[in-house]
Regions:
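Short, charged/polar micro-motifs that form catalytic or ligand-binding hotspots
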Residues: 37-41, 89, 132, 155
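Hydrophobic (often cysteine-bearing) scaffold residues that line and stabilize catalytic clefts
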Residues: 43, 47, 95, 138, ...
């Protein structure tokens, strides 16, 4: 909590159980002080400062922090930064895709090498018409990457580097700036239908331009704090990674 106000503690009793209520401004719009590893687009996620306050207050290093509705993983990532062991759970498969890889941050050079090794079939297309979202070359790169990742998983050869690339690519599929693979649209968790996208394109007078997916993956990997660890080994930056449980 970076607020200048002191936290107010109120106690409420419900069925003879005393419940503490903490009142304060736990983050403000000017605060960008959390770790950049949290910079993942996800609908209705809260700022890391909120779980940090309660994790510091209610637990000690090496304690277990359990999040039954993990979402993009804000709570468990923040808990691990505070040297807690964590258990993460969420019915949405996106939760694991977006959370797990951030416990095993790879070198930027390794990401480049892996991306360079992936063959791109220029004629590759999705099973459905996505021309209203992607330039043909961009779509070919996305489909080729998907084919590579699926083949690695099916062969039992998928590693943490593959999972990192999948995480970043998933988070960059659609959005509202040139930092995404698509033309201007909404992010994956607010995705519109192809018919709606056609209307958006017509209204804005836009058409999909080529986006270099590999360059975008590299750039966003850098934003997610790769630079801090570029000179270190590609092992986990968290002491708790060997005990990670994502169910």
């Amino acid at each position: 909590n970076n607020s200048s106000q002191r936290t107010i503690l109120e106690k409420h009793e419900v069925d003879s159980i005393v419940i503490n209520k903490y009142i304060n401004e736990f983050w403000t719009s000017r605060q960008r002080q959390a770790s950049s590893i949290h910079e993942i687009s996800y609908r209705a996620c809260f700022k890391p400062q909120l779980p940090r306050f309660f994790i510091n207050l209610l637990s000690e290093p090496k304690d277990i922090v359990y999040d039954p509705f993990s979402g993009r993983g804000t709570t468990v990532i923040e808990a691990s930064l505070l040297l807690r062991n964590i258990i993460s759970n969420d019915i949405n498969p996106l939760s694991e895709i977006l959370t797990y890889p951030r416990f095993f941050i790879p070198k930027l050079t390794d990401i480049r090498k892996r991306l360079d090794s992936i063959s791109i079939l220029d004629t590759a297309k999705a099973d459905i018409d996505l021309s209203m979202f992607y330039h043909p070359r961009t779509e070919a790169e996305i489909v080729s990457l998907k084919t590579y990742l699926m083949s690695r998983r099916e062969a039992g050869e998928e590693d943490n580097l593959d999972k990192w690339i999948r995480m970043v690519a998933t988070n960059r599929l659609t959005g509202h700036s040139r930092g995404f693979f698509s033309v201007y649209t909404l992010p994956p968790n607010q995705a519109v239908s192809p018919q709606q996208q056609v209307k958006i394109n017509r209204r804005l007078g836009q058409k999909p331009e080529y986006r270099d997916t590999h360059a975008i993956i590299i750039k966003n990997s850098d934003i997610l704090n790769i630079r801090m660890y570029s000179s270190t080994s590609s092992s986990s930056i968290f002491d708790i990674s060997s005990k990670l449980s994502i169910k």
